[in-house]
Amino acid sequence: MRLAVAQIISGADPTANLGLIRQYAVEAKKTGAELVVFPEAVMRAFGHPLNDIAEPLDGPWANEVRSIAKNLDLVIIAGMFTPGRDGSVRNTLLVTGPGIETSYDKVHLFDAFGFAESESVDA
């Protein structure tokens, strides 16, 4: 299996970040990749509010990632934010593509070097 890693910088706009996913997924497909991995916060970069963009796994952002994967016949792993408890979010990886549909919620949050993921992310 050939895979691609898209080490990109996402911004604050989830729609613009979908454009990045589409762009780099197309490039990965052109190189013969069957799977492309995006960063954990590709939906919206850390450092911006997260609870206002969190959505369930069947929401429009995740469905657009599914559509990109389906149209390219490519497995995509992309980090998004889903609703957590008490107004927080979950740091979720969506894995979608031909023959696969699953997700993973991060459980070991990064609280070090002045960054406290646990202040806004639920584990």
Locate predicted features.
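Short, flexible loop segments at the rims of nucleotide/cofactor-binding pockets, characterized by
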Residues: A12-T15, I53-L57, A112-A116
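N-terminal phosphate-binding loop and adjacent alpha-helix
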Residues: Q7-Y24, D58
